[in-house]
Structure formats: C-alpha cells, structure tokens
C-alpha cells in the first residue's frame, strides 16, 4: 500500500518528513522522532488537521490519544483546545468546530492507566468487581501486600509435612530470616504483571528447568546468548593480541616477542571456526589454548621500555579473557550443568505456585476492602477486552468508536499495554489506524519493565514507502540544539550505537540534522574537562596534609569554578524569546548526573563560589536530621522502651542533653532499658538535666495519651507546637528546606491516615519498612521553576527538558551492576534464574542459566546506559560540557589508544560491551578527534572526519585543593601571629583584591548621605558638623544603638532606657485632670502587670518629676487644652539634601522620620512639646548655662519637627518647647531661624 499524502503547501514551515507524519493515512504508522525533532507539535497538528477538516467527519471523541504522563495529557488537551478555538475564531459559523470544542472534555486524551480506569468504570460487570471501588495509592497497596504475603507464608509454615516449601526456604533464604524469600515472591509478582498472562509466564518459567529431553547445552533455548558471549570474548582477546603485536613491531619494540604473539593469534583464530553443535568440542578447543612463555630480552636497553610494558599488558589481557571464558562457561561438566537445572525444577515450581497464590490472595484482599491499585487497572482492562483469547464485544465497540489511536512515547510501552492498544485498534490489516510516536534511542525505562524491542521490531518491519506491515517515518531534524551539540552527539554515537550492542543502528536515518537557527558563535565548542587524580610527585607532605579530596569533591569544584567563570565573563546565550544574545544566568545551566550521590559535594562547591544551587533529590528524606529526629520521637511515643530512638530524642534539641549527661543516665541504672535508667536518674538527681528530663517525661505521657485519642496528624502538629521544633529548624542553615521536610512529614502522615490503616504503631512500622526496602522519599520541594539557580538533576529527570548549557558530570562513575550480580535474576523471555545450592554438601555455585541470563541482562543494561547517555547529550540547546575524573590520565589515554588506529567508524563490539562507565565510551570515541590527536601528539591515531568542535582541558587535582591549602596557610598565619612574627602578605587573589580596594565610585558624595534617617541621628550629626567639616568625618562618630533585651534591662538601666520609661508613662497618663501621686503609682502598677514596663523601669521613674510637669505653666496649658493634645505623633518627611548639608550640591532628598512627644493642635497654630530627661541639676553652674547647651543640642531636632509638622498639617508651628524633668525647666526654641 503506497502513501497517499497531499502536496505540502509552499509557505509551510514543516519539513517534508514532518508533513508526511501529519498527513499519512491508510495504515499503521510509526514515527521515529529523534530528540528535539518537534514530535509533540507534529502529533498535535495531525490531530487538529483531522478535526478541522469538516469533509472527514471526524469528532475528537473518536480519537484515543495516549500519553506517558498526566502532565503530558493535560498539555496535549490544552494545545488541542487552543488550536480549536483559534480555528473557530476564523470560522465562527462552523457547527463542526463548535461541536469539537464541546466534545473536548469528553475526549480520551490520557495516560493508558487513566484509559484503563475509564474502561473499568464503564464495564465493571465484565470484570466481576464492585463498581464502588476506591483507587488506592502505592503507599496503601504496599501495606496490604505485606500483610497478605506474611499471612501466606505463615500459612505455608503451619502446613504439616510441607517438604517442598521448606526445601524452597532452605534454598533461597539466609540463616536467620526469610526476608529474601519475601522479596523474591514480591519481585516475581511485579515482573509477571508486565506480561498479558502472568500465570502463563510463571508456568513457562518452570519449563525452562525441564532438561530431561535435552542432551547438550547447545540445545538450551538461551544457548545463542552463551555463544555470543564466548565469541565476543574471543574477539576481545584477538583485539588485545593485535595491539600487542603492533607494539612489538614498532621501532625499538620487543621484536623477540613476535613469534610467541603470532602463535597466540593463530590459536585464537582457530577458535573462530568452532563448530557450535557440540558443547564438548567447544570446551576442548578453548581448553587447548596454550599461551607459551614469552622469551626474555637479553639487552633490555635496546628496547623501548614503554613498548615492552604495553606489549606484556595487552598479552596478559588476552590471556585473562580466555581464562574468564573457561571459568564462566566450562568450570563444570556439561552433564552437571544440565542436572543442576533438573534438580532446581521442584523449587521453581513451588515458588511459581506461591507467586500465583499470592497474586490471587492479594487481589481478593483488595476486593474485600473495595479497593484497586494502579497495577490492577491494566489487567482488569485486559480481562474486559479479551475473552477466550479473542477481542470481546467491549473491545469491538472501542474498535468501532476510535477512528485513530495515537500513542506518544511508544518506546516506553510494555507487553500488557501493547496488547490493550492492539485490542482497541482496527483489526483489519488493510485499515490500520495505529499512530505511534517515539524514539527508541531515548528508551530509558527498562527498570519499569518498558519493552523497547516492540518499537524496534516495528521499525524494522515498517517501510518508508508504505509497503509491508506499516509506514515508517523518520524525523531526524533537530530544532532544539546548535550545530555544535548535534555534531558532538553524532560523532560519539556513530561510533557507539549499532544493533549488536545498543539494539539499534545509528545510521543516516537516526543521526541528528540541524533544524534550529542560531546566530554564529565562537564560544559553543563542546568541552571535555578531565581532572587527573594522580598525585604530583613533587608535592611535599605538608601540601597534602589536608584530607585528600575525593573524586566527587574535586569534580564538583572544577564544575563550580567553570560556572563562576562563565557567569563572571558574561558568557553569551541566545535568548529565543528576545531573539538576541544576552549574558548567561544561573537558571540557564543544568548539571546532569546518572545518580544524585554527588549532590552534597556539588552543593558545597557551589557555596564556596557563591553560586545559587538546587539539587532535585529523590532520596535522603529519612536521613535528614529533622525528619530522623521526629521519626525517633514518634517511635518513643509508640514505645519508649527503644534505646536508640530514645537516646536520639534526648540528644536532640527537643530535650537537649549532652553525651556526658546521657552517660550519667546510664550509670543511674547500668542494666536494662534506657528508659528505666532515665526514670531512675530523674528521681535521684537534682540538676538542670533532671528538670529537662522531668518536663520531657510529662510531655511524653501527654503525647502518648494524645496518640490514642487523636489522629496521627493532630499528634504531629501538637509536637511541633509544644516543642517549637518547627521554628527551631527554621533558624538552622537550610531552614526553609528543613521546615518543608517537616511539613511533608505531616502531609505524608495525613495521606497515610486516608488509607484503611490507622494509628501511630502502623505508621512507624510502615516507615521502618520503607527504610529497610530502600524506598526513600525525596526531600520536599522548595524551589519554583523560575528561580535563578543552577539546577542539578538526574538524566532520567531531564528527559523531555532542554537547557541552554548542559554539564554532564560523573562520567567516570561506574555503572550500577548490582542487579546483574544479584543471587536471583529475572528475565521476560526466560523467567527466573539463580545459583544452585546443594543443601546436603552446603555448596553454592552458578547455574548455566544464571550465567546466560546474567550476560543477557548485562547487554541490556549496556544498551540502556548508552541510550541514557544519548538523552543526556541531547538536552543541550547551545553548549555541552562533559566532566570526569581519571585516576591517571597517561594510563587512561593509553587504554583508549588501543582502538584509535582502526579504520572502521564503529568501535569493536567487545570494547563497547565491556564498558564500565560513560567515560569508557566517550574516551574511546573522542580520542579519534583531531583535537585529541594534537593533544597527545600521537601519530598512530586514525582520526574520523567530522565538523565537531572540541575543546579539551586536562587539569590536575591540585588546581582544586585551594580551599584546603588556604585553610592550612591560615593556620600557619595564626601561629605566626602568636609568635609575634610577620604574616606573609601573599595571595593568589592579590591583584583582584587591590583592584576592588582601589576602586573609586564616581558619586562618592551620594554614598555619604543616608536615604533614610531619624531626626535623632540628624541631630547628632549636626552637633558634630561645623563650617570646615564634611559629611564623611561624621561617619567616624556614628554609632549603632540597639535596644537591650528585656532580660538585660532587669539590671541598672541606661539613661536612654530611663528616658524611654518616662516617655511611656507620659504617653499613658490621663490629661482630663491633674494626676496625683496615688494616680501615677496605680498607673505604673497596671503597666507592670500588663508587661508594658519592667520593675526596674518603674523604680527608675521619678513620680515627683512627673507631677512637677503638671504644676508648671506648660503642664497647666496641656491640661486646659487636653482635647486638642496629641501625643507620640510619628511622621515621615522628604527633605532636600542641600538643606541639611551646606557643602552639598546634590539634588537628592533624605527621608527623615521622628516622633513628636506632644503637640497642641489649635485651629490656626500648633505648639510642640518635647520631654527631656537630661541631667541638669548639679551639672551646670546655673540654668542659663544649661539652657545655652540644651538649645544648641536640640535646636536642629525641634526645627526639623516643626518643618515636618507644618508641611504635613498645613498649620504654622507658633511655639516649640523643651521640658526638662530634672529641675522642672522649660526651654523655648526659636524655630524661625534656618538650619
């Protein structure tokens, strides 16, 4: 069937392939959309094109659109809705478009789980389930699962003569617990659920152990895996020998070794012609390999030492490969290998039945509770859609309803999901209506049991011309990244990806081509930053005395230094929205890593460089101090007889005991529970610690009672309130994050209580299980998407995102091979494999099946890691920076050189398949770039033609020891000071510091004037300023005055504090009558009771001085006009700078603030009164002398008050008075004169 595609409009921006993907019809379609190729836009446009075409008569509810996440589904629905509204605005009379807008909310645009839920809700009777079921979260599902599994195992243990089960327990558990069996059943259950028929898969798993009719290992279904692995290792050994021969053949090479090496190679070549029909023949051929001893070199000085060592190294590597083949595949007789499998068959059958029983019990328990979990949705939908292995009537109704089924991220589909989708699509081969979009090079979810082979099978079967099984369309044009990023990605992956190792070829159809339009730049070359961790032979012990930095720390510092340079140098970034270059911002940079283990080191390095940083970590929640403390406290409330949690709480800020006090508690009762010792210590000891313990015991008892009466969240919040722990952690470094973590604990407890489980005990047990299983929770998120910070995230978390600058870190970190070396291995094709345990002889050894599946899983893991690296490289829009540490760059580069002289573009499969980290791949590819050849000055390197721009930096770890060395020097400086010796004035930042210190700001005068000042401060300044002074001299006399805390005010008060107390009383005293001494005493007593004044302040107040004011003429006026008196009047007023400072010609203003003690506001005038507590009597010869000083001191203040009040009220200030309590003196201020 050919393609039927309308001609592309002349003015369209779509590429030919994009247009084809939008318009193609008539068959199933697979769109292989490379990174950044605009697949979402193509998918949305295809949908819109179909919906706006009124001749096609397609409604939006006749489409099934499946996305990978709920967020993607919401975005898809939003885009479609927006496009429909735009189309309707251009054609407002279209009833068809109006109908589509109305139907959009009913359209099936969702994740597959959501679609399955819709099927179950509509057709629950077909699955024989209660329609009122509740969908539970994984948290509740895991708790039900654990209970059901424990009940199942308890039942098996209780059955008499249950020999098969007990043999299984002995074979698959440790000496003390059956936790391994518990976990194995759970793993097998989860794995089986990724298959359309879990029970059938479990039964087939048993069949792989049936070897009665198998006479040779070559007849085993997984023998091709074994054969491929042996061939791979033989080829690797051959490659090593060819390298050895090359070194021996060099001028000054160890030529006497050549005869032995060529004999080795001849033997290896004979292994390439093995007949694989007979296992014993293969074994004999490999065992016959005889590596002769290489001859001794008579005159060693005639030979290049490096060539000799490299020749030996490569030959030893070849010998090791052959030895490993013998150990892994031929260490036991063929009959024993086959017998092992037959002996294990009863155990495999028993565990298969256990898993099936558990699955039934688990589902029945959920049914009893009226709940379903997410794993149930797909299988129940499948049960509804498939009856007796054929599509049910429900499935046929969906086939009629959906004119097209569109699937995004198809590469991450598993077998169950594939079966469901095929059941709701058109079953007629000539009318395929399945539209799949994805990129198998970005399939990185195998750990979630995604099956990329589904995509790859269709990719190979479908044809670009539309003939055959379906239509294949390749979208390779990248609209995200600069050419420099694409060239780097292509250069690396043309050498790495092919079907043998990566499960897909990186050919012309797969390579990335430029589609984005960026302005030219000379700054965007891909950078490879390698830090050589080899120690400098010339460095002294003193230089290394600080603790040697770990690899993560060194690399983090190198990255932080790089970022700081980019920010400081205003690295240019093209802003697509502004359509112009701008300086780089922190938010433009992301650091990607395979895992987040280096995040703490990265955060520390960023702090040193003053770089705002955020790491989105999905683990470590339970390890945070604040959460660990709260969990420990909850455990103690549940049961105080738990020594470790109790000690943690006592040592925490909640109680605040130190180590010595904890030791004294234990001495109070040396044996038994620590809680008993705590009670004993409390009763026999009189101390501050005993008081704190007594208070804690009281609180603990109250909390224990509360945990019974109230729900868990009420308990947690009560603890936060009573202990102030929430506020306390807020004051610690990272307080915002810590408080968010505590809120998250409250929220998670709330979420827990919404399940069928209740109570503190079960919650604590649930948390313990999470910790044991390693199912940690991520720390609470406190960062918004738009905050200007450098972000760090995993490569998986970055999928689908893009960033201007991407730094890929930790490239030398080893791949996580933990699953591969597990005792038990699971595989979709061959089921379950483990080592064989001979219970009678107490011997454990690997089975042939375990070895085969181990190799298969290893190859799958390598293929997935290669795809993860592809995802990482393709996140960059403009610049790509690759960073790694190497133990010894000279030795590492020599390893890379072994393949640098080959002519083929693709690297040998053995090199790619045996990689231990991303740097193994990157190093072996980048070394064939001209930049690396120039760096190493190595003529043997066969460079590959490329336009890739590469910048290589090799740095030593010493470059990043600065902090430790500077701390070390600082210690020496301290010693110099103690010894009264000069401190050396040397610094790596000397020039930079001098530049900063000598910098002169052009508007110095403006910096001497505060933008906001109090009247009191201005008064002090003017008392110091005269005709020859300038404002800068005032700084020498300015002093910050802060209120002392109240507990310090309990002692002798300062003059300022006494004045404050007097003013407070004058503000509170009634003016409706003349107060008596009794009135004032009563008022002061009331103010103390209300905590307005302290006892010390009241004692400092002279009541007779207060009464003296009301006896004065000024006081009498205040009493007479009390209804016009305003007290403590605050004001703010803008005053020209030139009016304050005679020498200033600035046109700026200063905001002055003050408080008028008292003012009498009449209709046309205002009288100001300011109270003073200055010492007068006995200090001056007479009042006249005192008055002169006081006028000079306070004139500026009162004039500022007057000008401000006049400007604010619009009334003239006619009089202004100072009243001095000491001596009852009244001083009138002349406010007519200027400043």
Curated annotation (Swiss-Prot):
Annotated InterPro entries: AddA, DNA_helicase_UvrD-like_C, DNA_helicase_UvrD/REP, P-loop_NTPase, PDDEXK-like_dom_sf, PDDEXK_AddAB-type, Restrct_endonuc-II-like, UvrD-like_ATP-bd
The record's Gene Ontology cellular component field reads: cytosol; DNA helicase complex
> Start and end of every UvrD-like helicase ATP-binding domain?
12-482
Recall the GO molecular function terms of this protein's record.
3'-5' DNA helicase activity; 3'-5' exonuclease activity; ATP binding; ATP hydrolysis activity; double-stranded DNA binding
The EC number(s) given in the record are: 3.1.-.-, 5.6.2.4
Q: SUPFAM superfamilies from the entry?
A: P-loop containing nucleoside triphosphate hydrolases, Restriction endonuclease-like
Q: Which domain of life is it from?
A: Bacteria
- Provide the GO biological process annotations: double-strand break repair via homologous recombination
Q: Report the catalytic activity.
A: Couples ATP hydrolysis with the unwinding of duplex DNA by translocating in the 3'-5' direction; ATP + H2O = ADP + phosphate + H(+)
* Residue intervals of the UvrD-like helicase C-terminal domain: 509-800
Q: Where does ATP bind?
A: 33-40
Per the entry, which co-factors are needed?
Answer: Mg(2+)
Report keywords, A-Z: ATP-binding, DNA damage, DNA repair, DNA-binding, Exonuclease, Helicase, Hydrolase, Isomerase, Nuclease, Nucleotide-binding
Query: Disulfide bond: present as a keyword of the record?
Result: no
**What family classification does the UniProt entry report for this protein?**
Belongs to the helicase family. AddA subfamily.
Under HAMAP family, the record lists: AddA
Subunit structure, interactors included = Heterodimer of AddA and AddB/RexB.
Summarize the protein's role. Answer: The heterodimer acts as both an ATP-dependent DNA helicase and an ATP-dependent, dual-direction single-stranded exonuclease. Recognizes the chi site generating a DNA molecule suitable for the initiation of homologous recombination. The AddA nuclease domain is required for chi fragment generation; this subunit has the helicase and 3' -> 5' nuclease activities.
The protein in question is named ATP-dependent helicase/nuclease subunit A
């Amino acid at each position: 069937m050919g393609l039927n595609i309308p001609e592309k409009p002349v003015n369209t921006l779509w590429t030919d392939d994009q247009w084809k993907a939008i318009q193609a019809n008539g068959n199933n379609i697979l769109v292989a959309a490379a990174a950044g190729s605009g697949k979402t836009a193509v998918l949305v446009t295809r949908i819109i094109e179909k919906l706006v075409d009124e001749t096609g008569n397609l409604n939006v509810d006749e489409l099934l659109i499946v996305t990978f996440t709920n967020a993607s589904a919401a975005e898809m629905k939003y885009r479609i809705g927006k496009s429909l509204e735009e189309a309707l605005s251009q054609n407002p009379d279209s009833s068809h478009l109006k109908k589509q807008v109305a139907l959009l909310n009913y359209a099936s645009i969702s994740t597959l789980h959501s679609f399955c839920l819709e099927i179950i809700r509509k057709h629950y009777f077909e699955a024989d389930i209660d329609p009122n079921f509740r969908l539970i979260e994984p948290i509740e599902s895991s708790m039900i699962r654990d209970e059901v599994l424990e009940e199942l195992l308890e039942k098996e243990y209780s059955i008499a003569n249950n020999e098969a089960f007990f043999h299984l327990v002995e074979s698959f558990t440790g000496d003390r617990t059956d936790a391994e069996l518990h976990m194995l059943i759970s793993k097998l259950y989860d794995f089986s659920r990724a298959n359309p028929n879990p029970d059938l898969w479990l039964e087939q798993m048993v069949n792989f152990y049936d070897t009665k009719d198998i006479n040779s290992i070559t007849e085993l279904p997984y023998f091709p895996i074994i054969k491929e692995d042996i061939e791979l290792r033989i080829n690797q050994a051959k490659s090593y020998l060819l390298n050895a021969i090359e070194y021996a053949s060099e001028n000054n090479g160890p030529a006497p070794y050549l005869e032995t090496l060529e004999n080795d190679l001849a033997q290896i070549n004979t292994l390439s012609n093995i007949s694989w029909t007979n296992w014993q023949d293969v074994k004999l051929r490999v065992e016959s390999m005889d590596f002769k001893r290489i001859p001794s070199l008579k005159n060693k000085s005639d030979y290049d030492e490096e060539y000799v060592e490299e020749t030996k190294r490569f030959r030893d590597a070849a010998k090791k490969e052959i030895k490993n083949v013998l150990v892994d595949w031929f260490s036991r007789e063929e009959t024993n290998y086959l017998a092992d499998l037959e002996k294990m068959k009863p155990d495999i059958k028993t565990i298969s039945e256990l898993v099936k029983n558990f699955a039934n019990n688990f589902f029945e328990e959920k049914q009893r509770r009226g709940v379903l979990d997410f794993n149930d949705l797909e299988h129940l939908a499948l049960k509804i859609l498939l009856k007796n292995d054929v599509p049910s009537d429900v499935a046929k109704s969906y086939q009629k309803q959906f004119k097209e089924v569109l699937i995004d991220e198809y590469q991450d589909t598993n077998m169950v999901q594939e079966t469901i989708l095929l059941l709701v699509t058109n079953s007629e081969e000539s009318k395929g209506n399945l539209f799949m979009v994805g990129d198998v090079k970005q399939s990185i979810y195998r750990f979630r049991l995604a099956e990329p082979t589904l995509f790859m099978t269709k990719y190979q079967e479908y044809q670009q011309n539309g003939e055959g099984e379906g239509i294949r369309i390749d979208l390779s044009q990248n609209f995200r990244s600069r050419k420099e990023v694409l060239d780097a990605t292509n250069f690396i992956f043309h050498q790495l990806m092919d079907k043998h190792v990566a499960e897909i070829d990186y050919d012309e159809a797969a390579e990335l081509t430029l589609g984005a339009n960026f302005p030219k730049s000379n700054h965007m070359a891909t950078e490879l930053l390698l830090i050589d961790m080899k120690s400098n032979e010339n460095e002294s012990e003193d230089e290394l005395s600080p603790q040697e930095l770990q690899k993560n720390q060194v690399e983090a510092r190198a990255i932080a230094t790089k970022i700081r340079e980019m920010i400081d140098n205003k690295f240019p970034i093209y802003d697509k929205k502004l359509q112009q270059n701008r300086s780089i911002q922190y938010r433009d940079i992301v650091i990607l890593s395979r895992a987040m283990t280096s995040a703490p080191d990265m955060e520390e390095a960023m702090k040193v460089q003053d770089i705002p940083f955020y790491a989105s970590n999905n683990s470590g929640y339970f390890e945070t101090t604040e959460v660990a403390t709260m969990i420990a406290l909850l455990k103690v409330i549940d049961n105080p007889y738990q020594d470790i949690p109790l000690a943690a709480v006592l040592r925490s800020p909640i109680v605040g005991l130190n180590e010595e006090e904890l030791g004294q508690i234990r001495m109070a009762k040396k044996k038994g529970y620590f809680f008993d010792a705590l009670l004993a210590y409390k009763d026999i000891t009189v101390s501050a610690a005993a008081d704190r313990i007594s208070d804690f015991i009281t609180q603990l008892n109250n909390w224990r009672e509360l945990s019974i009466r109230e729900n868990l969240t009420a308990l947690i919040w009560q603890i936060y309130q009573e202990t102030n722990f929430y506020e306390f952690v807020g004051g610690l470094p990272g307080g915002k994050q810590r408080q968010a973590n505590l809120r998250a604990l409250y929220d998670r407890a709330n979420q827990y209580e919404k399940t069928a489980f209740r109570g503190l005990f079960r919650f604590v047990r649930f948390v313990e299980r999470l910790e044991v299983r390693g199912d940690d929770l991520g720390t609470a998120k406190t960062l918004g998407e738009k905050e200007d910070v450098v972000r760090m995230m995993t490569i998986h978390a970055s999928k689908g995102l893009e960033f201007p600058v991407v730094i890929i870190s930790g490239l030398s970190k080893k791949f996580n091979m933990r699953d591969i070396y597990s005792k038990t291995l699971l595989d979709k094709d061959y089921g379950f494999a483990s080592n064989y345990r001979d219970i009678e002889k107490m011997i454990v050894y690997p089975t042939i099946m375990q070895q085969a599946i181990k190799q298969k899983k290893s190859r799958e893991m390598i293929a997935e890691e290669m795809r993860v690296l592809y995802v990482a490289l393709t996140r960059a829009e403009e610049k790509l920076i690759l960073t790694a540490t190497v133990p010894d760059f000279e030795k590492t580069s020599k390893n890379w050189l072994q393949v640098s002289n080959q002519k083929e573009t693709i690297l040998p499969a053995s090199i790619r398949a045996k990689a231990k980290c991303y740097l193994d791949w990157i190093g072996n590819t980048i070394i064939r770039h001209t930049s690396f050849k120039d760096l190493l000055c190595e003529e043997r390197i066969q460079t590959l033609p490329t336009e890739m721009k590469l910048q290589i930096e090799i740095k030593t770890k010493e470059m990043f020891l600065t902090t430790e060395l500077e701390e070390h020097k600082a210690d020496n400086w301290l010693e110099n000071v103690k010894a009264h010796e000069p401190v050396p004035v040397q610094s790596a930042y000397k020039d930079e510091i001098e530049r900063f210190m000598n910098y002169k700001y052009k508007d110095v005068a403006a910096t001497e004037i505060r933008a906001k000042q109090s009247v009191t401060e201005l008064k002090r300044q003017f008392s110091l300023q005269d005709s020859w002074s300038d404002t800068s001299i005032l700084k020498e006399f300015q002093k910050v005055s802060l209120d002392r805390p109240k507990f310090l005010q309990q002692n002798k008060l300062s003059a300022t504090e006494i004045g404050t107390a007097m003013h407070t009383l004058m503000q509170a005293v009634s003016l409706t009558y003349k107060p008596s001494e009794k009135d004032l005493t009563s008022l002061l007593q009331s103010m103390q009771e209300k905590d307005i004044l302290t006892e010390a302040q009241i004692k400092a107040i002279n009541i007779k001085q207060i009464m003296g004011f009301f006896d004065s003429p000024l006081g009498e006026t205040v009493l007479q006009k009390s209804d016009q008196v305003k007290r403590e009047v605050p004001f703010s007023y803008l005053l020209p700078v030139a009016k304050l400072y005679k020498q200033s010609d600035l046109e700026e203003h200063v905001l002055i603030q003050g408080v008028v003690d008292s003012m009498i506001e009449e209709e046309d005038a205002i009288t100001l009164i300011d109270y003073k507590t200055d010492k007068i009597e006995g200090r001056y010869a007479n009042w006249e002398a005192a008055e002169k000083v006081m006028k000079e001191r306070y004139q500026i203040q009162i004039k500022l008050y007057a000008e401000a009040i006049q400007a604010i009220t619009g009334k003239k200030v006619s009089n202004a008075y100072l009243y001095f309590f000491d001596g009852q003196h009244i001083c009138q201020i002349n406010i007519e004169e200027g400043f």
